[in-house]
Amino acid sequence: MTVIDEIYSSSSAIPTVALNDEAKMPVLGLGVAKLSDEETESSVLAALEAGCRLIDTAASYGNEAAVGRAIAASGIPREELFVTTKLGTSRQGFHSAQESCKESLDRLGLDYLDLYLIHWPAPKLGKYVESFEGMIEARERGHVRSIGVSNFTEDLLATVIEETDEVPAVNQVELHPRLNQAELRQVHAQHDVTTQSYSPLGVGRLIEEPTVTTIAAEYGRTPAQVLVRWNLQLDNVVVSRSSKPERVAENLDVFDFTLEPEHMEAIEGLHDGTRVLHDPMTFMGT
């Protein structure tokens, strides 16, 4: 199981986790799904200014170029950043996965990706295995350093591992108190796959949940900060999204407090299997 290298209870520094390929990935980053170009640039710049070094985008978001502009404007050395993007469903395939990777690099204005993910498995399409094989080739050519998947179930993950003899470094999935993905996280631990959580606030639905607001008040924190912290304390990597720069910085400020076991358990008790986004087994979009 992946383990957070360092978390200092009195520090705002964002620690890293070691992936199964020995790359180091920040445990908390910014996602830019559904943000306009203007919102993307302002959010990325705010995140970078606040110390964030993990930026997560996707070809289907349509804002890779905006991410690239913000990175360039920040002046932060490339080697200090961890940039993730994702392969769109319409580009799945051995050769098209490699071509799409290079197209994403062109839009981002980068020479390599830190992490490249299959965005959605689209099992009915039947191309996720050959797509992953194409990503292996892209890694061999130096276009990407780590490769992984997103929205993969236990069975789909097992198929990729069995048919390619390659263990994805990361599986990025919807994960929040209503959908804690406990069984999937156990499978990840068995294979040394890092669990990365998106939609940690349940698309905003959980910030008014009484259990969460009560705990937040006790710690003098926002509900969003408590939800992000809960996810981190499960040893997950987290990407959180906001179009408001002040919220971006606020959601990153979660490394100077620790939730007590009883509060972790109370939040865990909210699990009911509710998925607020798409079903990975049937979704054919993006």
Swiss-Prot record:
Signal peptide: none annotated. One of its GO terms (molecular function) is aldo-keto reductase (NADPH) activity. NADPH binds at residues 201, 203, 239, 241-242, 247, 251. It comes from Mycobacterium avium (strain 104). The keyword NADP applies. SUPFAM superfamilies: NAD(P)-linked oxidoreductase. PROSITE patterns: ALDOKETO_REDUCTASE_2 (PS00062). Pfam families: Aldo_ket_red. The active site is at residue 61. It is an enzyme of class 1 (oxidoreductase). Belongs to the aldo/keto reductase family. This is Aldo-keto reductase MAV_4483. Gene3D superfamilies: NADP-dependent oxidoreductase domain. Keywords: NADP, Oxidoreductase. Its EC number is 1.1.1.-. It comes from the Bacteria. The keyword Oxidoreductase applies.
